[in-house]
UniProtKB/Swiss-Prot annotation:
Species this chain originates from: Arabidopsis thaliana (Mouse-ear cress)
Bilayer topology: Multi-pass membrane protein
Family under the similarity heading: Belongs to the major facilitator superfamily. Proton-dependent oligopeptide transporter (POT/PTR) (TC 2.A.17) family.
GO molecular function: transmembrane transporter activity
Tissues/organs with expression: Not detected.
Subcellular location, record wording: Membrane
Signal peptide positions on this chain: none
Protein name: Putative protein NRT1/ PTR FAMILY 2.2
Broad class of where this protein is predominantly found: membrane
Described function: Transporter involved in a passive nitrate efflux.
GO biological process: nitrate assimilation; oligopeptide transport
Length: 516
């Protein structure tokens, strides 16, 4: 009898124990490859699509593209929260891939049916018919669908793939393949798909994106029985919000200097928690302060010391995150404007080949791969050998700021050269744009700031007309140089100092650790 019970228990455990592992690898990687080709295929050439197919003015098309890219880069955080807190990664990926497929099919229909877009006209013509409200409405619905679909798979697919493995070494190997596949799909979408859109037809280009998305969706769903399904564990953002709420509700309480007046959590958390909250950002120490009205069961009024310290750790890096946002704004502005520059340059390579304007962005991806490889294998080890100490993370950030400033300066010089060439009646080769484009890597949240910056410049100056041949884009780049210099000195070189995590939080910082 006992033997039959054991056998029954083993059979009930076997299905879950057999899930996960390397048998899920082909499904995850094939899904990622198809979704990457589809996603980069439509987003890389969006500015050109809006200008040529919807007769939208160049600057307005750039701003719309920035908003779309901003959503694609920010909404994955929302998708990750939904996956972690409520649904799990696998259902979110399935639904998102299907939504993305619907959006790309709608984009394909827009390019196939003439009444879903305005009549075509010559680029830059003042007689172009604007799209109707119905046509714009359908376009925005399609873009909303592909944005939600792309955002829903960006982080969750990586997390779901890593969760299939138990050993850290296997997870690391998966991430290596993950990024290799991601870049392969991005390069394929930014070259083959974009070339098809501009040289064959937009209908065929979006159709190929739809096929890639459909195949990836079918592959992912067919492997569902092999996946290890992660259970929702709750969002870490909830704990951060609870600290703010608890501290605010007890804002009038007097901060104590006694260890026993603070809540240290229950069970294992209470044993590993800090004895006293640190003195930095003391206002939030009230969240862990025990008062007469507090209850251990009410975690929106009483948090543990460890939760308070976790919140402070996140709060300390906010200025650095803001620095990343502001330093990324010049990069994404450059990314947007360089497509407009490419449209008015000579993109021919020989008599029969013309580089698509949207494909220029693939240089960012290729350059990022090369630079990361060179840094990890050559530059950083050589510096450590010569200086007898490694580069700190903030020093690497500072070096990145310098290169971004140089990139903006080069962009300004190249644009001034291009304008001079245009006034002389000649067209400039698109290869000139490669030099300044190599230094830029797109970071998503800055697309919104880039949109606001372009709007501000357009309203206050005459530097950004719809025909940039009559504008001063070089002055825009010089303005971005100034922004980059101010950002570097105010945040990277001035505000930040290192903390030694092995020492007490209250210990005075060593001035030698200042980042310069």
């Amino acid at each position: 009898m006992a033997r039959s019970v054991d056998t029954e228990a083993m059979t009930t455990r076997d299905p879950s124990s057999k899930r996960g592992g390397w048998k899920t690898f082909p499904f995850m990687i094939a899904t990622l490859l198809g979704l990457s080709i589809a996603s980069f295929g439509w987003v890389m050439n969006l500015v050109v699509f809006l200008i040529k197919e919807f007769n939208i003015k160049s600057i307005a098309a750039t701003q719309n593209s920035n908003i779309v890219n901003g959503c694609v880069s920010m909404l994955p955080v929302v998708a990750a929260i939904l996956a972690d807190s409520f649904f799990g990664n696998i259902p979110v990926i399935s639904v998102s891939a299907f939504i993305s497929l619907l959006g790309i099919i709608l984009l394909t229909m827009i390019t196939s049916l003439d009444h879903l877009r305005p009549p075509p006209c010559e680029t830059g013509s003042i007689l172009c018919e604007s799209p109707s409200k119905l046509q714009l409405g359908i376009l925005y619905i399609a873009l909303a669908l592909v944005i939600i679909g792309s955002a829903g798979t960006r982080f969750t697919l990586a997390s779901a793939g890593a969760n299939q493995y138990e050993k850290p070494k296997e997870q690391g190997s998966f991430f290596n393949w993950y990024f290799l596949t991601l870049y392969t799909g991005a390069i394929t979408g930014a070259t083959a798909i974009v070339y098809t859109q501009e040289n064959a037809s937009w209908k065929l280009g979006f159709g190929l994106c739809a096929v890639a998305n459909l195949i990836s969706f079918i592959v992912f769903v067919s492997g569902k029985r092999y996946y290890k399904h992660d259970k929702p564990m709750g969002s870490p953002f909830t704990n951060l919000i609870r600290v703010v709420v608890a501290a605010t509700r007890k804002r009038k309480a007097v901060i104590s200097s006694r260890e026993e007046d603070y809540h240290h959590g229950l069970g294992r958390e209470g044993k590993t928690s800090s004895a006293m909250p640190s003195k930095s950002f003391r206002f939030f120490n009230r969240a862990a302060l025990k008062t007469e009205d507090d209850s251990v069961n009410n975690n929106w009024r009483l948090c543990s010391v460890q939760e308070v310290e976790d919140f402070k750790a996140v709060f300390r890096v906010l200025p650095l995150l803001l620095a990343i946002i502001f330093v990324s704004t010049p990069m994404v502005t450059q990314t947007s404007l360089i497509i407009l520059q490419a449209l008015v340059t000579d993109r021919g390579l020989g008599p029969h080949f013309k580089i698509p304007a949207g494909s220029l962005q693939v240089i960012v991806i290729i350059t990022a791969c090369i630079v990361i490889l060179m840094n990890n294998c050559l530059v950083y080890p050589m510096y450590q050998k010569l200086a007898h100490k490694p580069l700190t993370p903030l020093q690497k950030v500072g070096i990145g700021h310098v290169f971004i400033i140089l990139s903006m300066a080069i962009s300004a010089i190249v644009e001034a050269k291009r304008l001079k060439t245009v006034t002389n009646g000649h067209s400039m080769s698109v290869l000139w744009l490669h030099r300044d484009f190599i230094a830029s890597v797109v970071i998503g949240i800055s697309f919104y700031l880039s949109t606001a910056l372009i709007t501000l410049i357009q309203k206050t100056t005459k530097w950004l007309p719809n025909d940039i041949n009559h504008g001063r884009v070089d002055n825009v780049y010089w303005l971005l140089v100034i922004v980059g210099v101010l950002n570097y000195f105010l945040v990277c070189a001035w505000f930040y100092r290192y903390r030694n995590l092995n020492d007490d939080d209250d210990q005075e910082q060593d001035p030698k650790d200042d980042t310069t």
